[in-house]
């Protein structure tokens, strides 16, 4: 039975899944919006929300925790200096999912995952 089992496997082992989610979180933080599948977006929401909450603390330990997930100090700097201060008035709900419809090749549901303060240019 699958009681109390949280999260999606996304067809990957744990190490691959964690690296993929960290990379996708970095891309979302850098660009403000990414196009992905619905399942990946729903998993990524939690990762990004946790990272932004960590970034709001803005201390050395918080930066080290963020580097552990994001693996790129430039992205961490962007998160702490630009993204987190903009979202300081919120306590959660930093992302939104916009559905785009099925992908041409395999029919997977495509979505935009974006930060709520992202301005479309």
UniProtKB/Swiss-Prot annotation:
Belongs to the bacterial ribosomal protein bL17 family. The lineage of its organism: Bacteria, Bacillati, Actinomycetota, Rubrobacteria, Rubrobacterales. GO terms for molecular function: structural constituent of ribosome. It comes from the Bacteria. It holds the Pfam family Ribosomal_L17. The keyword Ribonucleoprotein applies. This is Large ribosomal subunit protein bL17. Part of the 50S ribosomal subunit. Contacts protein L32. One of its GO terms (cellular component) is cytosolic large ribosomal subunit. One of its GO terms (biological process) is translation.
């Amino acid at each position: 039975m699958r009681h109390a089992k949280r999260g999606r496997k996304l067809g990957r082992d744990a190490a691959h899944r964690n690296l993929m989610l960290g990379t996708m979180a970095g891309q979302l933080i850098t660009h403000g919006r990414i196009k992905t599948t619905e399942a990946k977006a729903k998993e990524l929401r939690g990762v990004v929300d946790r990272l932004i909450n960590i970034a709001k603390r803005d201390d050395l330990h918080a930066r080290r925790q963020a580097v552990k997930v994001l693996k790129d100090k430039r992205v961490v700097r962007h998160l702490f200096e630009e993204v987190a201060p903009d979202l300081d008035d919120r306590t959660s709900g930093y992302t939104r999912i916009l559905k785009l419809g099925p992908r041409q090749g395999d029919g997977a549901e495509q979505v935009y995952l974006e930060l709520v303060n992202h301005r479309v240019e």
